[in-house]
């Protein structure tokens, strides 16, 4: 009579031995070699603990309408004109003070509630005998980040240009870029640099000196800089015409560096560990099957229906 395959169920083969046997010692050794070396490999390959991460964010930047201008005149080496929005600075300039006409506007081009660009124009009246050879200009901004930690600071854009021939206009078109010497925190409120770049209440001339202002600003770990201003110097000024500065300053999306939190570090380390562990699990599983099937270490093989081994452990 012909026979047909009617039913089947899997059988698991268990190997039994005493706790003090060579088989138990072998299993303990292979378990240690399975789980510990992947940890060492991941750690020694560098980058196991994520110490710095980054993300993109559009900063919330607003022009504070604070300006400090120094226009270098020629041909006399010490000739200059100066003006700022700080009354004390203006009083200190004496005969060098010259009040310009200033206009500015900011635009939110993509209507996301954050300004994207500043259009700044300054017209400095000049005498027919006065000729501008160089410009030093400071504009201050309020700079905020909110996606990870809340970071607030008052920053500046510093522009300095000088040329060999007198000019009539200066065109500047650049980006206000963030510069970090250290990463930000991943949470909390950071207002350590939310102080005025220029101490407008100080009665001392040193606090308005450009060298002092720039040096103090560069001591910060987080600053902004006017990147790629691409200055265009136009010559040929009419006798009664003012010297004009046109500036277009964009506020681009930034890549922010920050210190990751504990759970982000664990997640990053866990991914590296598991990816290496899977290889070790596969290799040592084959080694254990070979050793026990070929009785390299003495054990008692027992055929057990699938699931019975788990029931024994539970009982």
From Swiss-Prot:
Keyword list (alphabetical) reads: Cell membrane, Cell projection, Cilium, Cilium biogenesis/degradation, Glycoprotein, Membrane, Transmembrane, Transmembrane helix
Name the glycosylated positions.
194, 199, 221
Keyword hit for Lyase = no
The organism's superkingdom is given as Eukaryota
TM segment ranges: 23-43, 262-282
The principal localisation class reads membrane
**What happens in the null mutant?**
Embryos die around 15.5 dpc with severe vascular defects. 10.5 dpc mutant embryos have defects in patterning of the ventral spinal cord that are characteristic of defects in Shh signaling. 14.5 dpc embryos exhibit microphthalmia and polydactyly, consistent with disruptions in Shh signaling.
Statement: the UniProt record of this protein carries the keyword Transmembrane: yes
UniProt GO cellular component terms: ciliary membrane; ciliary transition zone; membrane; MKS complex
Location within or outside the cell:
Cell projection, Cilium membrane
Q: How does it sit in the membrane?
A: Multi-pass membrane protein
GO BP: any one term: camera-type eye development
Query: What InterPro entries would the database entry show?
Result: TMEM231
Q: What is the similarity comment for this entry?
A: Belongs to the TMEM231 family.
Question: Could you give the subunit structure recorded for this chain?
Answer: Part of the tectonic-like complex (also named B9 complex). Interacts with TMEM107.
Q: What does this protein do?
A: Transmembrane component of the tectonic-like complex, a complex localized at the transition zone of primary cilia and acting as a barrier that prevents diffusion of transmembrane proteins between the cilia and plasma membranes. Required for ciliogenesis and sonic hedgehog/SHH signaling.
Report the protein name in the record: Transmembrane protein 231
Organism of provenance: Mus musculus
Q: In the record, what lineage is assigned to the organism producing the protein?
A: Eukaryota, Metazoa, Chordata, Craniata, Vertebrata
Gene that encodes it: Tmem231
């Amino acid at each position: 009579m012909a026979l047909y395959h009617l039913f089947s169920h899997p059988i698991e083969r268990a190997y039994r031995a005493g706790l003090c046997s060579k088989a138990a010692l072998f299993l303990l050794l292979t378990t240690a070699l399975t789980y510990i070396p992947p940890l060492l490999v991941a750690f020694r390959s560098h980058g196991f603990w994520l110490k710095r991460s980054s993300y993109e964010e559009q900063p919330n930047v607003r022009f504070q309408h604070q300006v400090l201008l120094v226009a270098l005149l020629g041909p006399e080496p010490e000739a200059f004109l100066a003006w700022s929005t700080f009354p004390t600075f203006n009083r200190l300039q004496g005969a060098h003070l010259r009040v310009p006409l200033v206009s500015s506007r900011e635009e939110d081009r993509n209507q996301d509630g954050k300004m994207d660009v500043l259009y700044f124009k300054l017209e400095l009246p000049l005498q027919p005998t006065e000729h501008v050879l160089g410009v030093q200009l400071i504009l201050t901004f309020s700079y905020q980040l909110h996606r990870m930690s809340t970071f607030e600071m008052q920053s500046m854009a510093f522009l300095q240009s000088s040329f060999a021939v007198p000019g009539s206009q200066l065109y500047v078109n650049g980006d206000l870029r963030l510069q970090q010497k250290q990463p930000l925190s991943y949470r909390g409120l950071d207002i350590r640099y939310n102080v005025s770049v220029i101490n407008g209440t100080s009665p001392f001339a040193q606090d308005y000196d450009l060298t002092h202002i720039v040096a103090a600003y560069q001591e910060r770990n987080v600053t902004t800089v006017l990147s790629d201003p691409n200055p265009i110097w136009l010559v040929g000024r009419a006798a009664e015409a003012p010297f004009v500065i046109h500036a277009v300053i964009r506020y681009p999306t930034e890549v922010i560096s920050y210190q990751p939190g504990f759970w982000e570090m664990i997640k990053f380390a866990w991914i590296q560990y598991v990816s290496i562990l899977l290889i070790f699990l596969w290799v040592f599983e084959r080694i254990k099957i070979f050793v026990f099937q070929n009785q390299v270490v003495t054990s008692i093989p027992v055929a057990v229906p699938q699931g019975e081994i788990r029931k024994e452990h539970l009982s």
